[in-house]
Every structure is written in structure tokens, then in C-alpha cells.
Amino acid sequence: MIQTQTMLDVADNSGARRVQCIKVLGGSHRRYARVGDVIKVTVKEAIPRGKVKKGQVLKAVVVRTKSGVRRTDGSLIRFDGNAAVLLHNANEQPIGTRIFGPVTRELRNEKFMKIISLAPEVL
């Protein structure tokens, strides 16, 4: 579960390394974001000559969480860390052209099919 002030790793090649959640989108007093939810983030750590710079405010979709995701068959998929993929603020398409690490099947809707197709592994 991701909330305000949570630090996340970035799972794409946009140039950011670490981001911090500053708002969970989708409701006036929404507290937690799970896998597949869109959040507002600020870049805390970035590599030189990347597509994004430190201090930029962007949207991101959560792709991995330590708390995991519960499936309807009762199974629970957990990850070692929290990770997100950065999105353009206007059209919510990914900034990076590559995705690192596995992503879950919960992202499989019309909005995030691009992330599913770029990911090396879908759990």
C-alpha cells in the first residue's frame, strides 16, 4: 500500500531512480494506492542526461508493492520493493521505452496495455 511520502523505485528508463508519492489520485480523501493505481510523484533522484529531472512533478502508475496483490483464487503476489512507472501528465502514457522487472496482470486494462507489452515478465 502506497501513501503520501512513500519512496518508490522507478521501473523504467525515463532517467529517474527514486520518486516520492505526494498524492494518491482518485478520490478526495483516498489514503492508499495499490497495484494499478495512478499517483502523483516528485523525482527525488535522477541520472544525468535523463528524460526527467530532479524536482519534476509527474504522474506514475504503481507496478509492484511490498504489501502485494490478492487474487480471486486466494493467492498473494508480493515483491521485495515498491516500484512505479512514470507517465506523461497529459495522456498518461509511459515516458520510458523499457520496463525493468516483472509487473502484475492487474495492469491489463486499456490504459496500461503499453506497459504490459514493454514488460519482460507479467505475473
Swiss-Prot record:
GO terms for molecular function: large ribosomal subunit rRNA binding; structural constituent of ribosome. One of its GO terms (biological process) is translation. Keywords: Ribonucleoprotein, Ribosomal protein, RNA-binding, rRNA-binding. GO terms for cellular component: cytosolic large ribosomal subunit. InterPro entries: Ribosomal_uL14 (IPR000218), Ribosomal_uL14_bac-type (IPR005745), Ribosomal_uL14_CS (IPR019972), Ribosomal_uL14_sf (IPR036853). It comes from the Bacteria. HAMAP family: Ribosomal_uL14. Binds to 23S rRNA. Forms part of two intersubunit bridges in the 70S ribosome. Part of the 50S ribosomal subunit. Forms a cluster with proteins L3 and L19. In the 70S ribosome, L14 and L19 interact and together make contacts with the 16S rRNA in bridges B5 and B8. This is Large ribosomal subunit protein uL14. It comes from Chromohalobacter salexigens (strain ATCC BAA-138 / DSM 3043 / CIP 106854 / NCIMB 13768 / 1H11). The lineage of its organism: Bacteria, Pseudomonadati, Pseudomonadota, Gammaproteobacteria, Oceanospirillales. The gene is rplN.
